[in-house]
Amino acid sequence: MKSSKKDIFILHIWLKLMGCYVFMFITSVVLPIAAMFPNLGFPCYYNTLVDYSKLNLREKNQAQHLTPTLFLEAPEMFFYVTYSFIVDCCSLVYYALAAVAVVKAKKHAPGLMALSQWIMAVGSPTLLYMAVLKLWTIQLYIHTLSYKHIYLAAFVYCLHWLLSMVYTECYITNVSSQWTSSELKKTIPENILLYRVVHVLKPIMMNVHLSVVALETLIFCLSFMMAIGNSFYVMVSDIVFGAINLYLILPIIWYFVTEFWLSKYLPRQFGFYFGVLVASIILILPVVRYDKIFVAAQIHRAVSINIAMIPLCALVALLVRACRVYTDRKKIAYTALPSKPQTIKYTKPIEPSTKQAPDSSIFLEEESDTDFEQ
């Protein structure tokens, strides 16, 4: 069936936003590579924020210069930037394949509004716009780190983290109720490319994005607490504990959000838990690398215990999610009634439920006559 003018307009907007996404991705890949060379306008190497060998956990911040607190060093920051852009590249391939699938599926549209519904199932124009903003904010973050503006960097990354959280939630829920999201997927014919994109490729991309969200939550906690530590006259050790405990609390909140809401849309959500496990390894590296500094400050054991609680909570949440996925398999899912009513054929004649004796009517007539005579 031919699509409506509204659906054609949404398709054109969606394809144009995809072109903007491709352009922004190219600039986002070029920027961190160019930022590694000082002669291209970047004053400092963004991966190395401060000299963490001068970390002193027993002192308070100094207003004259940047006080080093717990943050990622060059190898960890390089891993995060590389992994996030690899995921963005996979997302670009996903959207490109989805665009081809939607254009090819136009001739299979069963109704006037089917095309816009399929675009919503793949990723709405609003979702693409948020993806463009995500790439733009990560570019700003690299710029601000290169100029050592930690306050502006913390603010920019806060925006990036919030965009990433909202993007992931909208990506999973399709910005609709559970019933509507399920019905959107049911309208796609099974024998076309779009069906495989929505039902196979999209859940994989969701889990990959969730792993990136876990790493971005760690960067947000460290950036936010570094800005706090250089804004107030506090102990550096308090900032270290604050960053670790903040990263312990935020994933726990996400675990509850997953179990009570997001799992209804995507039961097999395991990417965030694996991302938290990788982030906890990244977080423990400074403790191992600067073991003497933490031991001298007498907070080595407390920091190690707090960091160890992060993967422990992630493993417990992962076990709960796996158990719920296994138990939900045994539940009977709702299925719609058949469109055509089924006819029932009886092979035997229907027997009456109550039987009456052949002479019962005679007795009734006699009783009525005697009553009348009296």
Curated annotation (Swiss-Prot):
Q: Where in the cell is it found?
A: Virion membrane; Host Golgi apparatus, Host trans-Golgi network; Host endosome membrane; Host nucleus inner membrane
Write the record's keywords in alphabetical order, separated by commas.
Disulfide bond, Glycoprotein, Host endosome, Host Golgi apparatus, Host membrane, Host nucleus, Membrane, Transmembrane, Transmembrane helix, Viral envelope protein, Virion
Q: Which residues lie on this side of the membrane: Intravirion?
A: 1-16, 104-117, 171-207, 260-269, 323-374
Q: How does it sit in the membrane?
A: Multi-pass membrane protein
Residues spanning the membrane: 17-37, 83-103, 118-138, 150-170, 208-228, 239-259, 270-290, 302-322
Q: Which GO terms describe its cellular component?
A: host cell endosome membrane; host cell Golgi apparatus; host cell nuclear inner membrane; membrane; viral envelope; virion membrane
Residue ranges, Virion surface side: 38-82, 139-149, 229-238, 291-301
A Pfam short name: Herpes_glycop
Q: What is known of its domains?
A: The highly charged and proline-rich cytoplasmic tail might interact with the virion tegument.
Name the job this protein performs: Envelope glycoprotein important for virion assembly and egress. Plays a role in the correct incorporation of gH-gL into virion membrane. Directs the glycoprotein N (gN) to the host trans-Golgi network.
| Similarity remark | Belongs to the herpesviridae glycoprotein M family.
Q: What is this protein called?
A: Envelope glycoprotein M
Protein encoded by which gene: gM
